């Protein structure tokens, strides 16, 4: 972690096979009392748990845009509208996907009715499932992720995020150069 001038504030050493999002809490606990207003991180840290932690502590997380991981030719999750009142998703064919269960990772699963989807004109763009059931997931802390998206679109946040390359990325680049890790 570094400050806005590129000075290293703190660091943690973690195994290379651990994902950034899993090691974040250890570093954050060391930095929690320095009075951060913003926490500018890369896409590896864009998780509901980190968003909740930062927002609950009054820190604005500045996450980058992350491209949806949807197959070409299929509807993206954003094309399914979440209906908060009914706690259901509405598909592009104007049918409901109702809440089914919450999995161990904290994702609520919303499933369509296979009999309805079987006759739908959008089936080939929606799912390849043999039983014609579309499943859309929503994390229990998805509201925090939506707040982070609102922050990302706030005036000045794009410029603030662009300073990462001048601060923390420069530190990593210098370290790689000095220790012979460029090839």
Regions found by a protein language model. Give the residues of each.
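Anion-binding and metal-coordination hotspots
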Residues: 1-183
